[in-house]
């Protein structure tokens, strides 16, 4: 009876450890997904901001050219 309890306790302990490791990996994967989404947002905002900046610069150059008579 003692060996049965001992082996059941060992199985329970190993199962608990493996479950906790799986949860940690799952949490780590969720964090990676959030980081990727933030990078995508940042990439989109940077692209949009660069486009607006370039467009504004081009419009300013054209306005200066019209004023000066290029």
Swiss-Prot record:
One of its GO terms (biological process) is hemolysis in another organism. The keyword Signal applies. Disulfide bonds join 65-70. GO terms for cellular component: extracellular region. Keywords: Amphibian defense peptide, Antibiotic, Antimicrobial, Cleavage on pair of basic residues, Cytolysis, Disulfide bond, Hemolysis, Secreted, Signal. Pfam families: Antimicrobial_2, FSAP_sig_propep. Residues 23-40 form a propeptide. Residues 1-22 form the signal peptide. InterPro entries: Antimicrobial_frog_2, Frog_antimicrobial_propeptide. It is found in: Secreted. Expressed by the skin glands. Antimicrobial peptide. Weakly active against P.faecalis X29. Not active against fungi. Shows very weak hemolytic activity against human erythrocytes. Belongs to the frog skin active peptide (FSAP) family. Ranatuerin subfamily. This is Ranatuerin-2SN1. It comes from Sylvirana spinulosa. The lineage of its organism: Eukaryota, Metazoa, Chordata, Craniata, Vertebrata.
């Amino acid at each position: 009876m003692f060996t049965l309890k001992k082996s059941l306790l060992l199985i329970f302990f190993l199962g608990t450890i493996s479950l906790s490791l799986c949860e940690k990996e799952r949490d780590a994967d969720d964090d990676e997904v959030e980081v990727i989404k933030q990078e995508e947002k940042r990439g989109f905002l940077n692209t949009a901001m660069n486009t607006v900046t370039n467009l504004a610069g081009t419009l300013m150059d054209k306005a200066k050219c019209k004023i000066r008579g290029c």
